[in-house]
């Protein structure tokens, strides 16, 4: 079969297969074109999930009549001249309009600010019409009907009308988040109309736009992010650890204003929240990365959803460091949604069940000598020392535990000082003054305007964990000498990498040295790890260093060991505390970054405002 050139219509349909995957892809391309044209008002209307109709209207600069034929021709653009690595616009290939016109019925109507009237061109299945004059407002209107009529096989892969409409909404919201000064309107027969009014482009305006898109709960539980490293700037907001979602769809990332779904950024977010989130929960973020266009390649994927950074390690480190710094600076803070969940749990049911509940209540006064079932206590009853809450370590952990952390000092030292402070002064603290212990597991505290309930085990677990981590990372870890050195055979390049990081590995308790070509001799291992498969661990370290030029896997592993030690070494549920011990625990929480969640990501306390309590009793 002879080689021959493909017809233009086939070329455009192939390009459409790469760029136009579904109706949401069309909306993305058209809205990006409108923004590149300087639009301040963008309207999107759809029908049939975008398959029957997509209409995008903007008030941008418009297209002159003589350039309309070029606008629907392949690889014709006003956004790129010669340098593919200096891209400062959302679009640059000149493929969107011809690709859309090859698989649907496209109408392009436009008018420039200085023109007396507008002009229109249509493309039906790849066939362009002549340009004709029409009445038009300033800006551009693009209308797409019968999407994929020219490639009916693609229709079989479309989802339901509702799903396609939802995908369009998601695309518009993701773009709108990066352009708060632009007004967006979304309407159609397949959806509820949505309007996102323009707001200022400063931090407060961005936070309002975040509230419009993600919800006001996020705005109330977000931490500002602002960092810079070697010419790469990071701004935005990240949620506190106790405000999470069940999936990562609420993680928004932008590179030079372009919405992206980048694995490196997603991984950096996971790393920043590594020991702060429960399993299968995800943080809510809106991160904006700004850098020289020459330092990032956006020409990786036809849909421009993926990017490639010249220095990925720099970007990852910037994200992880900035989020962790924000979390540490947040102090003691719980999600506002926790109180709402508590209020819902307390809500009295309507109907027969409420009446039955009322009949069950005897109304008998409390004599003061009885003790409610389940137990609560503020009495100074005999109690074993808090140090006894920590069982002796076993299997070689005792020495490491003694070296890195004086566990008995976490609460008991502050307990002595706490007794000197007046109760009225404690009420003014963020977590207030301890009033009672309920079920020998929960501390009830009072602040000036709220009631705080603390899970004593989860809270103390975080305190012990943070102290252990600080001790571990502030000085070299204790190591144990092997009776017989372990010889590990490795590829030559892996052995070379490990030797190059020998000093770093020594801080973590490893003693490694070369043992001939392609071999490593391991003489010491961290005593905290006990007995491990040394060969497997060394190979994993070599792979980690090859991937990231660091040994993060071991640091994570040690952090997990610290978490396990903290769990076993913290106050247990069912442990009765004295008032001074409870107050000392609250003061330590206030002084410890990230104490709003335990190291498994569960909340350590819930705050219920006095106004919410009054609503429960019908006072408001």
UniProtKB/Swiss-Prot annotation:
One of its GO terms (molecular function) is ATP binding. It comes from the Bacteria. SUPFAM superfamilies: ATPase domain of HSP90 chaperone/DNA topoisomerase II/histidine kinase, DNA mismatch repair protein MutL, Ribosomal protein S5 domain 2-like. CDD domains: HATPase_MutL-MLH-PMS-like (cd16926), MutL_Trans (cd00782). GO terms for biological process: mismatch repair. GO terms for cellular component: mismatch repair complex. SMART domains: DNA_mis_repair, MutL_C. Belongs to the DNA mismatch repair MutL/HexB family. This is DNA mismatch repair protein MutL. The gene is mutL.
């Amino acid at each position: 079969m002879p080689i021959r050139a493909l017809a233009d219509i086939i070329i455009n349909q192939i390009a459409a297969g790469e760029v136009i995957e579904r109706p949401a892809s069309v909306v993305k391309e058209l809205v990006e074109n409108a923004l590149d044209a300087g639009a301040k008002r963008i309207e999107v209307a759809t029908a049939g999930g975008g398959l029957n109709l997509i209409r995008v209207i903007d008030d941008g600069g418009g297209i002159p009549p003589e350039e309309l034929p070029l606008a629907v021709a392949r690889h014709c653009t006003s956004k790129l001249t010669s340098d593919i690595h200096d891209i400062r616009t959302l679009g640059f290939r000149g493929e969107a309009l011809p690709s859309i016109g090859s698989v649907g019925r496209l109408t392009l109507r436009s008018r420039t600010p200085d023109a007396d009237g507008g002009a229109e061109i249509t493309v039906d299945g790849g066939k362009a019409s002549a340009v004709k004059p029409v009445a038009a407002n300033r800006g551009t209107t693009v209308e797409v009907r019968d999407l994929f009529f020219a490639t009916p096989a693609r229709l079989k892969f479309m989802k339901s009308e509702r799903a396609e409409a939802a995908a369009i909404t998601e695309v518009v919201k993701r773009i709108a988040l990066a352009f708060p000064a632009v007004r967006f309107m979304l309407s159609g027969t397949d959806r509820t109309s949505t309007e996102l009014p323009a707001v200022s482009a400063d931090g407060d305006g961005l936070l309002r736009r975040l509230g419009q898109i993600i919800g006001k709960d996020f705005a109330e539980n977000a931490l500002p992010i602002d960092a810079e490293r070697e010419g790469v700037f990071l701004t935005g907001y990240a949620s506190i650890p106790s405000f999470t979602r069940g999936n990562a769809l609420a993680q928004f990332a932008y590179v030079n204003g372009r919405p992206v779904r980048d694995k490196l950024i997603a991984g950096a977010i996971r790393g920043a929240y590594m020991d702060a989130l429960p399993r299968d929960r995800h943080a809510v973020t809106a991160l904006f990365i700004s850098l020289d266009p020459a330092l990032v390649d956006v020409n990786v994927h036809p849909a421009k959803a993926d990017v490639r950074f010249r220095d990925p390690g720099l970007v990852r480190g910037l994200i992880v460091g900035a989020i962790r710094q924000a979390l540490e600076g947040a102090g003691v803070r719980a999600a506002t949604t926790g109180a709402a969940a508590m209020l819902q749990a307390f809500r009295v049911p309507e109907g027969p069940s409420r009446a039955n509940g009322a009949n069950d209540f005897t109304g008998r006064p409390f004599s003061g000598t009885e003790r409610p079932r389940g137990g609560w206590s503020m009495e100074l009853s005999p109690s074993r020392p808090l140090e006894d809450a920590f069982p002796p370590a076993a299997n070689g952990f005792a020495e490491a535990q003694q070296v890195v952390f004086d566990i008995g000092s976490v609460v008991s030292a502050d307990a002595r000082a706490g007794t000197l402070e007046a109760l009225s002064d404690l009420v003014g603290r963020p977590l207030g003054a301890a009033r009672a212990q309920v079920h020998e597991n929960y501390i009830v505290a009072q602040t000036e305007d709220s009631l705080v309930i603390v899970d004593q085990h989860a809270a103390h677990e975080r305190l012990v964990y943070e102290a252990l981590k600080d001790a571990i990372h502030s000085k070299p870890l204790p190591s144990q000498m092997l009776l017989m050195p372990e010889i590990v055979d490795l590829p030559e390049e892996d052995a070379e990498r490990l030797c190059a990081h020998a000093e770093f590995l020594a801080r973590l308790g490893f003693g490694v040295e070369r043992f001939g070509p392609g071999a490593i001799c391991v003489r010491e291992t961290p005593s905290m790890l006990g007995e491990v498969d040394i060969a497997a661990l060394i190979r994993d370290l070599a792979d980690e260093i090859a991937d990231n030029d660091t040994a993060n896997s071991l640091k994570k592993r040690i952090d997990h060991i610290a978490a396990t030690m903290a769990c076993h070494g913290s106050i247990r549920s069912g442990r009765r505390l004295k008032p001074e011990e409870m107050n000392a625990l609250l003061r330590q929480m206030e002084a410890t970054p990230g104490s709003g969640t335990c190291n498994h990501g569960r909340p350590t306390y819930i705050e219920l405002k006095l106004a919410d309590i009054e609503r429960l009793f019908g006072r408001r």
